C-alpha cells in the first residue's frame, strides 16, 4: 500500500499528537495531491523523505525475503546499488513503475534522508527542505550533517536521465498497443472488475465509487438484450468503461507509484496505461502531480486563455 493513503486516514481531522512520517518520494507526492484535495493535512506532521532507488513488486519482494530477514535484504539491496551492481536480485529487478520514475528524491519533504552521492556505510545525509525540517535537525543536533556532498546532484541527474529514457520507451510501447478500441479491449482483457487497482490507488479517494452502486448492477434481461444486439457479450461487462472512467478522474493526480499494477491479481499492466495517459494530460496542463503544495490541481481553477489549439485562439 502507498503510505500516503495511511497518512491521509490519520490526518483528515485535527491531530493532538505530532506525526513523523518516513515516506518514499512517490508516497509524499501522492500525499501532496491528497492534501490539495482536502483529504489530509500537514498540520502537526513532519514529512521525512528518503532517496529511492526503487522497490520490487509485492510478490517479488516476498519471494526474495522469504529466506532472510527484511532488514538484511534491504541492506543487501543498498550495498548492491551503491557498489554499482544494480538493483536486480535473484534474477528479479525493481518494478516497471520504479524504473520509469523520474522523481527519485523528495524535495517537498520537510527533511530528506539522502542516499545518492553518499557512503551509507559511513554516515547518513540529512537535508532540511523547510523551516520546520531545519528546526528539527537543529534540535536533534544533526544540522552539521546537512551539507550536500559534492557529486550528489550529478548522481541524481544521471539516474533521472536513465529513468526518463526508460519511461519514454514505455510510453511509446504502451501507446502502440492501445491505439484503438480493439487493442485497448485486448490490453484489458484479463480484468475481472475486482477493483483492486481503485482500492490501492493512493489518490482515488471517493467514499463510494459509482461502479459499486446500482448504476452498474444491471438486470439479467439487459445482458441478453446486449448479447442479442451484438451477437455476443463479454463478461464481466464494463471493464473498459471502468478503466476509462478512472483515467478521466485520476489522470491529473496520478503520481505513477505503480500500486495499481501491484494489486492486480491477473497481471494487467495498469500502471503503464495510466502513466502514459496521465503524462499526456499533465503535460497539457503544464502540471506535475505532487510537485508542490501551492500549485492548484488543473481542474480546480479556471484559466481565461488556455488550449488555443482547441478554441482557435479566440478570447
Please identify what each model-predicted range represents.
Residues 122-131, 137-140, 194-215:
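Internal hydrophobic scaffold segments of catalytic domains
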Residues 1-184:
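Iron-sulfur-associated redox domains of electron-transfer enzymes in respiratory
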Residues 35-38, 191, 280:
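Alpha-helix boundary/capping residues
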Residues 47, 59, 193-196, 203, ...:
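Generic hydrophobic/packing signal
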Residues 38, 105-108, 194-199, 284, ...:
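Short secondary-structure junctions and interdomain/linker hinges
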Residues 24-29, 93-105, 189-210, 251-267:
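Local cysteine-cluster metal-coordination motifs and their immediate loop/turn environment
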Residues 163-189, 206-315:
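Ferredoxin-type iron-sulfur electron-transfer modules in oxidoreductases and energy-metabolism complexes
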Amino acid at each position: 500500500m502507498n503510505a500516503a493513503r495511511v497518512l491521509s486516514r490519520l490526518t483528515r481531522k485535527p491531530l493532538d499528537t505530532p506525526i513523523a512520517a518516513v515516506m518514499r518520494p512517490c508516497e509524499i507526492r501522492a500525499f501532496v495531491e491528497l492534501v490539495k484535495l482536502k483529504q489530509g493535512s500537514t498540520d502537526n506532521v513532519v514529512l521525512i523523505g528518503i532517496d529511492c532507488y526503487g522497490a520490487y513488486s509485492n510478490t517479488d519482494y516476498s519471494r526474495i525475503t522469504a529466506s532472510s530477514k527484511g532488514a538484511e535484504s534491504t541492506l543487501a539491496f543498498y550495498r548492491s546499488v551503491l557498489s554499482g551492481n544494480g538493483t536486480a536480485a535473484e534474477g528479479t529487478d525493481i518494478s516497471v513503475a520504479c524504473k520509469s520514475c523520474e522523481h527519485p528524491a523528495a524535495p517537498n519533504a520537510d527533511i530528506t534522508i539522502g542516499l545518492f552521492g553518499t557512503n551509507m556505510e559511513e554516515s547518513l545525509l540529512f537535508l532540511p527542505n523547510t523551516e520546520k525540517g531545519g528546526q528539527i535537525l537543529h534540535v536533534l543536533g544533526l544540522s552539521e550533517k546537512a551539507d550536500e556532498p559534492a557529486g550528489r546532484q550529478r548522481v541524481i541527474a544521471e539516474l533521472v536521465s536513465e529513468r526518463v529514457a526508460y519511461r519514454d520507451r514505455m510510453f511509446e510501447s504502451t501507446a502502440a498497443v492501445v491505439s484503438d478500441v480493439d487493442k485497448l479491449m485486448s490490453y484489458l482483457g484479463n480484468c475481472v472488475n475486482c477493483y483492486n487497482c481503485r482500492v490501492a490507488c493512493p489518490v482515488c479517494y471517493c467514499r463510494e465509487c459509482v461502479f459499486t452502486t446500482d448504476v452498474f448492477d444491471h438486470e439479467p434481461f439487459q445482458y441478453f438484450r446486449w448479447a442479442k444486439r451484438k451477437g455476443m457479450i463479454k463478461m464481466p461487462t464494463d471493464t473498459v468503461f471502468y478503466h476509462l472512467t478512472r483515467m478521466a478522474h485520476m489522470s491529473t493526480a496520478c503520481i505513477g507509484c505503480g500500486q495499481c499494477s501491484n494489486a492486480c491479481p491477473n497481471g494487467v499492466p495498469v500502471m503503464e496505461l495510466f502513466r502514459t495517459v496521465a503524462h499526456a494530460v499533465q503535460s497539457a496542463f503544464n502540471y506535475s502531480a505532487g510537485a508542490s503544495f501551492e500549485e492548484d490541481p488543473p481542474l480546480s481553477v479556471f484559466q481565461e486563455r488556455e488550449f488555443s489549439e482547441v478554441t482557435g485562439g479566440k478570447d
